[in-house]
């Protein structure tokens, strides 16, 4: 394997930007900083007037393989990922069939080994009747990024709504539990009310149906369970101002037992955008009123929110163009997340160092990933 020497670049790492060289041997960073001289005749890369970032780690993607490959594959989406600077991903279990057994989990790893262009890990899926299979994942702490629980329904019908089972999983899981938190009873009630009063639902109704209260109540429930059992809990795609009161920033990330993720679309869009984009920005949890977006930004900058991710969820254009109730939920974002955050760096909303912290360092720390997320 070739050796590379990146010369005179701006290295963005651990809260600082420093100028220097970086030596890479056999795919591994060997030396960082200063002027590096080597006798191995490496391939030199001129890094002057450029910034060198760690590869982005996205802890929430849906790459659709197996079973939904008319939408995407591990190969196609990992290709999009690396094109956008995402060099590691963690993929969700709502494929077809869902990743409910160890055999199906291993199948994903086998596919990725052959086709992925990026580093990878996969979440084990939970349902209402696969507890024994889920617990077998405890033996794979160094391979599997975590256990995913849909505490609210979304693409794939993986809803876990048995309170006794939820308590049991939180009590006995030795891996990180990642949750999709939207209270199903509130969603159903809101939908029924709207159907009773409106002839045709539209995209903007999504934020009313999957409202702030649905998110808060379910996140609160997950945190109660985590406190009860001292579970390592990671709540995905926080989308509301109200949920932020559930999270703290007193202790460093590495000491937190409960962490929170925010997604780029909740930092970028608001409910006002439904008027133009319609179902194209339909996603779960919903994009909501603008004050939520501003609160999310504040919480990201003050470290109540720990990680920036995408929840990358591709569909065909036909699947997105249906009526509101038929249109699929999800946005394709993995190729665009870094570029979007760099846009906000240019706007002065966030520093480049903070982007690297939230998209690289913190993800590696949250999931205890070695040799990734830092330079």
Where are these regions (language model features)?
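N-terminal metal-binding scaffold of metallo-dependent hydrolase/deaminase domains
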Residues: 1-39, 50
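Divalent metal-coordination and catalytic microenvironments
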Residues: 9, 22, 27, 49, ...
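Metal-associated gating/positioning segment near the N- to mid-region
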Residues: 50-115
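Short acidic/polar active-site loop segments enriched in Thr and Asp
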Residues: 86-88, 118, 145, 306
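Short catalytic-loop micro-motif centered on adjacent basic/acidic residues
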Residues: 90-91, 121-124, 232-237
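A glycine-rich helix N-cap at a beta->alpha junction
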Residues: 110-126
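Histidine/acidic residue-rich metal-binding segments in metalloenzymes
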Residues: 132-308
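His/Asp/Glu-enriched, well-ordered alpha-helical/loop segment
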Residues: 203-221, 225-230, 301-308, 313-375
